[in-house]
């Protein structure tokens, strides 16, 4: 009987039962092809059919037919269940509920790389963003630090590009604001791109331009670059970006700030309009107006963790310090709070370059040192001068320190970060260059030595710790001038402010807790710092430079909100501002309070007698000076201050209101009454003047910056009626949060709507020396005090400041050094003709010569030739003579054995070779050997 044809109408789940009924073309099937399982299920044609359920076996194992004719339905149901069980296993792993990477339709190589990377379940940002990106939509993604944003745009990029294209032209561009972030992105791309032949290049400042010329000539698929160096290569090589299909702006809010305005304007102008654009950052505003220049087309906004902002596993503590005590407070924090051990970490040995060269290359494995420890600490400072000063101070104190800042040499930056990652140092001192996107695996503590001027900078700084479920601590040193920024941060985070011991057992993960450090620990370290400054002239010079840099930093940093500045006075004048931090416990707080009370009593002590009245008492010991002082005291009464009068009033009230035997503390009772009075007045004012009392507490929690102004007697009356006035600022949204998330409004200077509207005017005529309505025209020149001459104001606005500039393709001014002709010289030196353009087939010669991936060995010639001898009859005689002298000094080429080209003493090998050469010459000339004379 021939096999029956498959049914043309598939079942609901597209399961063909004919394949299960007839496995072979013959009716006689060998029983050996069936594999019996333990429970009676027979595996046939790759499907597991449970015949016990199918036949309805009873407890005795015998089939029980019910005679109702539903055997076919039971068979089909069993077949469907087995098919579903088989399809649920992909790549050997079951699909997680809610959708895993397997459910996103990724290819097998990429799934294998994701598994090797250690990802099992996608994070929320990956689950939301990857499907949208695979649909080729523009996406703006925001999630807190450490949530897997890099993999969220790398995975769909690899899925879309799939493999290397022989057609010339890069297809993906990833822009990063810093070199370290670009290096980390390259690492993720290489790990997730295993199994593909995609070519990736890294273009950052500090590396050789010639090597990067070769990388770009080898036709890479993916470019990871910083804006400055990429624009330099684009202008120098006259690159075309028409083939770019996938553009990612990592840490987009930092990229679109004014620092990269010129570079991004030129790059965005060269990108094709049909590209897919992605923006990712941990701090993004809800409005996309500020990213209009990115050319987004109907973007999808994925904004997660906007309420949490920082990791829930992060605990924070803020310490009130004085300006001159920051160094001592930092040392006290490291010695007594974090308890960082002195000297290099245990088990780390410095390997020599020779041992590292002989070291066999192996596959990278996570270093056990690259795990968060209780000692690994990163310290953020304001400028690079602070980095150098603090790093040298900590090294002098005995700590193992690494340091990184923006202008540090690229190789030095890599070495310093690698030492910290591998556990060779416990402390890393950095500027904000390391605040964004860099994954520091061995990091448990963050110290804000200089308090951040923007709340979103704080979010990026503390995001270096408490990642991947690990606990972490963030410490901050707060001076009196930093209190407004602390209050802005408190409004942005939406947390409760606890000062001193206002609340018992505060939550360091959910509140903003402020207090002081232990006085005795800080004083000891301050004395040590003063001694070190006296003994080390270099350290003293570094401190002077850091002080000058701090003055400039204070002038240029963003200003805090006016409401926070007003609240700062109340906060610093409160009693809790000088209390010990709750982190040290109640016993230490009581001891500190007793110590402060004793010191305050000693400070307020005034002797009853003057120095003129000292001496033996009695009639026999009369002193004219003492008599004069006594007469003056009896004639003039002591003037009482307002504080003394208040204290007396409080003492009188307490004496009247309490029984005789009870002790009183006038100072504490006075402060308690004052606080109660202020609280009652604040409640009454809030009840009278709050027009939004019906709104929820969560919505009004952080609207302090937009509160109504209180009416003052004799002042101008506010014309705004809260019932009918419609403001341009939203009522229920957090203004503090939106201002902090803003790209150009991270600070509070110049970001009001009125100022922006005033600057948005359009002038149609500007022929005369003045504008309409008598407004003066902005001067085009200004006086430069340093050079004592007038300079153009336009140079200050575009950043040129008198330097040579050229116009780019978009019309903006760029540095003339971007077009220096180095690429033409490089092409001439390598004997390369015209390079292939976009769309042409790549040349195999370029791939062989310059196609090595970053990190792979490049084969270069190492032969060194000595220059030719100087010729007196040539014009370049003196130049050649100088080059020959340099070659002799460096022992290059034929001068490698010394001043002359020959050794003074010949070895046996040299003598044997010389005899062989002489014998060859004799045979060639066919001359008989000379006879020796007798």
From Swiss-Prot:
**What is the name of this protein?**
ATP-dependent RNA helicase dbp-10
Q: Where in the cell is it found?
A: Nucleus, Nucleolus
Q: Which InterPro entries match?
A: DBP10_C (IPR012541), DDX54/DBP10_DEAD-box_helicase (IPR033517), DEAD/DEAH_box_helicase_dom (IPR011545), DEAD_box_RNA_helicase (IPR050079), Helicase_ATP-bd (IPR014001), Helicase_C-like (IPR001650), P-loop_NTPase (IPR027417), RNA-helicase_DEAD-box_CS (IPR000629)
What does the UniProt keyword field contain?
ATP-binding, Helicase, Hydrolase, Nucleotide-binding, Nucleus, Ribosome biogenesis, RNA-binding, rRNA processing
Recorded hits in Pfam families, A to Z, give: DBP10CT, DEAD, Helicase_C
Keyword Nucleotide-binding appears in the UniProt entry: yes
- The Helicase ATP-binding domain is annotated at 130-302
Entry similarity comment: Belongs to the DEAD box helicase family. DDX54/DBP10 subfamily.
Task: Please list where the region (Disordered) is annotated.
Answer: 21-43, 343-370, 613-722, 851-934
Spell out the Gene3D superfamilies in the cross-references. P-loop containing nucleotide triphosphate hydrolases
DEAD box: where is this motif?
A: 250-253
EC number(s) in its UniProt entry? 3.6.4.13
Stretches with biased composition (Acidic residues): 644-654, 662-700
Q: Where is the composition biased (Basic and acidic residues)?
A: 864-926
- The record places domain Helicase C-terminal at 359-513
Q: Which GO terms describe its molecular function?
A: ATP binding; ATP hydrolysis activity; RNA binding; RNA helicase activity
One GO term describing the cellular component: nucleolus
Which species is the source of this protein?
A: Neurospora crassa (strain ATCC 24698 / 74-OR23-1A / CBS 708.71 / DSM 1257 / FGSC 987)
Gene Ontology BP annotations: rRNA processing
